[in-house]
Structure formats: structure tokens, C-alpha cells
Amino acid sequence: MGQKINPLGFRLGTTQNHHSFWFAQPKNYSEGLQEDKKIRNCIKNYIQKNRKKGSNRKIEADSSFEVITHNKKMDSGSSSEVITHIEIQKEIDTIHVIIHIGFPNLLKKKGAIEELEKDLQKEVNSVNQRLNIGIEKVKEPYRQPNILAEYIAFQLKNRVSFRKAMKKAIELTKKTDIKGVKVKIAGRLAGKEIARAECIKKGRLPLQTIRAKIDYCCYPIRTIYGVLGVKIWIFVDEE
């Protein structure tokens, strides 16, 4: 039988890079991993907390990032602060944190970085290490599976048909130069009693080719009918 494997871990070291760069003695290695997890969770919690505060006011975002409910267009800028990944580089006295984000409107606000640094400093074990936070905007947001998954989640929570949400997400990828995309949603779709999976694929998706650069994400969506699982594969290019 064929065995499924995570496309990112399968290509780590070839087309995928590590998101943490540091060295530690074997006895301190677990502490470093826990510190990285705390830093990433702290940043994600900060984004989520402040995103809820500003959900009632309009935030400038890409005009195509919208949800259609009851024949009205609803701006979804409040749900567009999606982090694609966080890089952590550790030196002797400095921790460099680079946040790769799709639409960094929230973090551009005055005092946002300083407030985030204070929260992160509490999570860092050593008081002698200083934090250096950098923000890097993703050039093509709809090329990232995390942003597409967040887009689908936002539409499903607003009672949009899951098929329409999947098709719209694939349409957004037409603006990029990707070679293939696959979207899969599993769970109690449309509130049905029996769970099932629906999948839409466009273009090529060579999962068994190691030199093929494939981005992937698995995203849970909590709805009134239960938890839905969204998986997105994007075939970027072949090296």
C-alpha cells in the first residue's frame, strides 16, 4: 500500500529550508526547541488577539480577498493577517525573529513591534539575549497555502458553500505563476450527517518527485457542524 508522507518534511534539505537556525549542546537541545515553539505561539497569539480587536473596522487589503454572503461583498481584511512561516536565528547574545506574513497591516501600526517584543521577551529563557524582530511581506500572497486555507476558513465560517470557496481559492492562484494546486476538504460538509471528503485539483502535482518544490499546509476549521480539515498542495516549480 502507498504510504502518505508530509511533502515538506520529505523535501527538507532539497527544496525546503529549515525555519530555525541555531546550535546547542545535546543536553540543551530540548530547551531550544521549546523556546522556539513558545516564540512562534506567542507571535501567532498576538496576531490573533489584535486581529479580533480590529475586526469591526476596515483594514486595507488586497481587493480580491473578499467573501460573498447574501449577495453582498464583505471585506475580509481582518482575516488576512496570515503568517506563512517564522524564521528564528539564534546567536550568542541575540535572537533574530523574521516574520513572513501575507498582509502586514497590523504589524505596521505604531508601537506594534515594541509591544510584541515585550511579550516575546517574557518567553525567552535568557535575560542576556536581546530580540531583533523583522517583518517580511510575502511577494505573492496567494501562492502560499496558509493564506488560501485562511481564505477558505473565513468563507466557510460565513456560511459560503464549500465548493464555491474551493473554486474561488483556486481562482486566486491564477494571478501567480504556480504550475498546479490541489485543495481537499474533509468532514461534515454542508452539515451532512456522514463525513466525507471533497477534492479539486488543477494542473500538475508531482508528489513523488523530490526536486519538485511543493508547498503544503493542513488547517483545521471549526464550524457549527464540527471540525473540518483543509489540506492544500501547491506545485511551485521543479528544480
UniProtKB/Swiss-Prot annotation:
SUPFAM superfamilies cross-referenced by the UniProt entry: Prokaryotic type KH domain (KH-domain type II) (SSF54814), Ribosomal protein S3 C-terminal domain (SSF54821)
Domain KH type-2 positions = 43-139
Signal peptide (residue range) = none
Gene3D superfamilies per UniProt: 3.30.300.20, Ribosomal protein S3, C-terminal domain
The Gene Ontology terms for molecular function here are: rRNA binding; structural constituent of ribosome
Instruction: Provide one Gene Ontology cellular component.
Output: plastid
- Cellular compartment(s): Plastid, Chloroplast
Q: What is its main location?
A: plastid
**Where are the coiled-coil regions?**
none
InterPro entries membership: KH_dom-like_a/b, KH_sf_prok-type, Ribosomal_S3_C_sf, Ribosomal_uS3_bac-typ, Ribosomal_uS3_C, Ribosomal_uS3_CS
User: What's a GO biological-process term for it?
Assistant: translation
Which UniProt keywords are listed? Chloroplast, Plastid, Ribonucleoprotein, Ribosomal protein, RNA-binding, rRNA-binding
PANTHER family from the UniProt entry: 30S/40S RIBOSOMAL PROTEIN S3, SMALL RIBOSOMAL SUBUNIT PROTEIN US3C
How it assembles, according to the record, is:
Part of the 30S ribosomal subunit.
State the similarity comment.
Answer: Belongs to the universal ribosomal protein uS3 family.
According to UniProt, the name of this protein is Small ribosomal subunit protein uS3c
Species of origin reads: Oryza sativa subsp. japonica
